[in-house]
A protein has these predicted regions:
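Active-site helix of classical SDR
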Residues: 123, 158, 166
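Alpha-helical segment proximal to the catalytic Tyr-Lys
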Residues: 128, 171-172, 231
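Short, small/polar-rich loop/turn modules that mediate ligand/substrate recognition or access, typified
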Residues: 174, 179, 233-235
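Short C-terminal tail/terminal secondary-structure segment
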Residues: 146, 223, 234-246
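A conserved structural motif in NAD(P)-dependent oxidoreductases
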Residues: 207-218, 229
């Protein structure tokens, strides 16, 4: 029996990059998986198809992470489809790589709405279905610990908020057997932050391993936190950053 057999997971922003890798890994470990996507239905469908081809169960739900009601609705649709919710992975996120002085408040609002408000909304809705036991997993960022490159001020602020939300919530729901943890990736090779992109050189330079990470390396840590082996870990901020914060 796989370690997540009979479990149900919801991965927000699961149509590409880190989110898609997480969804596929949780499905490979036995979970039925729902993913949300904002606009790209074809990418979301491709993730669902890949999971089903490997014998898993999956569904894609359209929900802009900046829309609180849509995010809450995605949680309810997940439960309606699979009958329960055991694991929530708050992966949806965005960044605007500009200096703080050049960033508009509309741009900052978008980052806050997705990275913070969307995370709060999904978590609050999910907790209603986790009366006893469950896993809440945030996908934060290594810049929530330490900012080593310029141009990420609003993003870093939101990821710092996610870090403290994790620690505070872990205290509130621990008595119900629910764990809350924050996985903090460093530079990971995705379409939004490619290892050959304009921002790659300074990010790679501050890692101890002198390379970008892979999406499967993040997914592996998330799978561990979602599984039974991590049952005594909560309120933790777990970096997978190639030693960026070493």
């Amino acid at each position: 029996m796989s370690k997540l057999t009979e479990k149900v997971a919801l991965v927000t922003g699961g149509s590409r990059g880190i989110g898609a890798a997480i969804a596929k890994r949780l499905a490979a470990d036995g979970a039925s998986v729902a993913i949300t996507y904002a606009k790209d239905a074809s990418a979301a469908s491709a993730v669902v198809k890949a999971i089903k081809l490997d014998g898993g169960k999956a569904v894609a739900i359209q929900a802009d992470a900046a829309d609180v009601e849509a995010v809450k609705g995605a949680v309810e649709k997940t439960v309606a489809t699979f009958g329960r919710l055991d694991v929530l992975v708050n992966n949806a996120g965005t960044a605007i790589p500009k200096t703080f002085e050049e960033t508009t408040f509309d741009e900052m609002d978008r980052v806050i709405d997705i990275n913070v408000r969307g995370t709060l909304a999904a978590t609050q809705a999910a907790l209603k279905h986790m009366k006893s036991g469950g896993r809440i997993i945030m996908i934060g960022s290594s810049v929530g610990e330490r900012v080593l490159v310029p141009g990420l001020v609003p993003y870093a602020a939101t990821k710092g908020a996610v870090k403290m939300f994790t620690q505070g919530l872990a205290r509130e729901v621990g008595g119900r057997g629910i764990t809350v943890n924050n996985v903090q990736p460093g530079p990971i090779d995705t379409d939004l932050n490619p290892a050959a992109g304009d921002w790659a050189v300074p990010q790679k330079a501050v890692t101890a391993l002198d390379r970008y990470g892979r999406v499967d390396e993040v997914a592996a840590l998330v799978a561990f936190v979602a599984g039974p082996e991590s049952s005594y870990i909560t309120g933790a901020n777990l970096t997978v950053d190639g030693g960026m914060n070493a």
